[in-house]
Amino acid sequence: MPTISQLVRKGRKTIASASDSPALKECPQKRGVCTVVKTTTPKKPNSALRKVARIRLTNGYEVTAYIPGVGHNLQEHSVVLIRGGRVKDLPGVRYHIVRGALDAAGVANRMQSRSKYGAKKPKQK
């Protein structure tokens, strides 16, 4: 335990916490280009084919991002917007693609939680 005079001389060091999404560099979203679009399997005990994309960001980082929703139109060279947010059962996936922005189309026929999936309000008859 330090003495008062030691604290006056040196002070206390603050521990800097590591960012959950370092590639964003404190930005809310970043733009990038898809280099690979593929499916991966989640870790135990889950089982599925999760859609992910490898993305080269405008700041030079290359990250893996999850493609949410049912079906997508992404392929190599698609320009996408990514946000932070990990996928718990996919190791190394710390970002989500924003649906309905840039080249990523919104989810078709989505009625609930539409804003999260970039779906337009259906026409009333």
Curated annotation (Swiss-Prot):
Entry annotated with the keyword Repressor: no
Record's GO cellular component terms: ribosome; small ribosomal subunit
SUPFAM superfamilies: Nucleic acid-binding proteins
Keyword presence, Flavoprotein: no
GO MF assignments: rRNA binding; structural constituent of ribosome; tRNA binding
Residues the record lists as 3-methylthioaspartic acid modifications: D89
Keyword terms: Methylation, Ribonucleoprotein, Ribosomal protein, RNA-binding, rRNA-binding, tRNA-binding
Lineage top rank: taxon: Bacteria
Annotated CDD domains: Ribosomal_S12
Residue pairs linked by disulfide bridges in the UniProt entry: none
Subunit description: Part of the 30S ribosomal subunit. Contacts proteins S8 and S17. May interact with IF1 in the 30S initiation complex.
Family membership: Belongs to the universal ribosomal protein uS12 family.
PANTHER family: 30S RIBOSOMAL PROTEIN S12 FAMILY MEMBER
Record protein name field: Small ribosomal subunit protein uS12
Organism field: Clostridium botulinum (strain Hall / ATCC 3502 / NCTC 13319 / Type A)
Organism phylogeny: Bacteria, Bacillati, Bacillota, Clostridia, Eubacteriales
Originating gene: rpsL
